[in-house]
Amino acid sequence: MDALKIPNLLLPAVKDLSAWAVIACDQFTSDGEYWRNLKAFVGDKPSALNLIYPEIYLGHDTEERIARINENMYSYLRQGMFRGMRGLVLVERTTQSGTRTGIVLAVDLEEYSYEKGSHTLIRSTEETIAERIPPRVQIRQNAPIELPHIMLLYDDCDGRVLSSVKRGKTLYDFDLNMGGGHVVGSRIENGEEVLSAMYSLADMSECMQKYGESDRLLFVVGDGNHSLAAAKVCWDNLKNSLTPEERTSHPARYALVEAVNIHDKALRFEPIHRLVKTDKPDLFVKYLQLGGEGKAVVAVDGRRGAVHFPLNIPEGIRALDKYIAQFIAKHGGEVDYIHGDGELKALSREGIGIMLPAISKDDLFRLVIQGGNLPRKTFSMGDGNEKRYYIEAKAIK
């Protein structure tokens, strides 16, 4: 099995790593001040900020930005801003939620699919929005390197993967900017042994025991699904022009990711609530009938009530989203996705707040195997400043 690979990494060879590493491009998409403050902090120092396209700026000077990003990548390579290393990296990220431990490795895009009902070893958790892929493809197709914010999850309840790790020398150890906490990266000395431990999690008999299905599943995508989908599209477009021999070893076939145990205590799963803004709130609530034996809390103008909600949470969210879309199409309004009970409570004076139950970590893999992709915005993993920061890179040309 070659789904996993020890990558040839490009590690930053710069003096100020706190200026180099920046948050995932899909965070703080409504917070221009965050990105302005980050740019001011970075200043003229070498930074991954110059190699990414923050989504808050999508649609603004797109062609020029992408051309500048690609040129910056080539310039950094020419100036020796990276040092090469073949190996896996043990990443220990400390945030307000605790210390989360991950492993940076490369995965075969032939073993990944974002299509619902797929049976690949690596699958998306949420429905992929087709229109969000092309901008990422446009950035990637001419880029010489990739910097990942993709986080894959694996189901290792007894911790066999991390217990197999032999920690080597420290590669980096620094504070992250903008309240991102602290990160330490160490070389893993026994990469092949660690990959073997990962492969064992997708053993057919083990999957049957854990999920009641023989469908072999190793990773689900926790963060960065649309970026991984863009990498897949770029690879599918490229491979048709390659010989069979070239396809097996081309660097674009493998995507750089960080893999984290879903049972990591510092990995928080939280529901994403809905806030519906409409001038007909009473009508919305009157016809909000989802059925089921569970409950969801509805708050309107500070008043709270409850509606029936299916015990199958993804099924309930799918039904709710369908109702919201139909209501807005007929009566007008808009929907926003809110993280945190307190924020929803505060905002419910501006609309109808629907507080959803959280899915359990223990159920995620089983839900993906049995039902395919979950509805969009089903859950989130921690706060925005806990997301992955760009540090390592890998050649894709």
What is each PLM-predicted segment?
Residues 1-180, 206-208, 216, 359-397:
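N-terminal extension/subdomain marker
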Residues 152, 176-201, 205:
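Portal/gating segments that form or line small-molecule/metal binding sites
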Residues 153, 221-222, 258, 355-357:
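Short beta-strand segments
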Residues 167-188, 264, 269-289:
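Compact, glycine/acidic-enriched structural inserts
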Residues 200-242:
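Active-site beta-strand/loop microenvironment that shapes enzyme catalytic pockets
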Residues 225-286:
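Catalytic or ion-translocation cores adjacent to nucleophile or general acid/base/metal-coordination motifs
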Residues 275-378:
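C-terminal catalytic or substrate-handling cores of phosphate/nucleotide-
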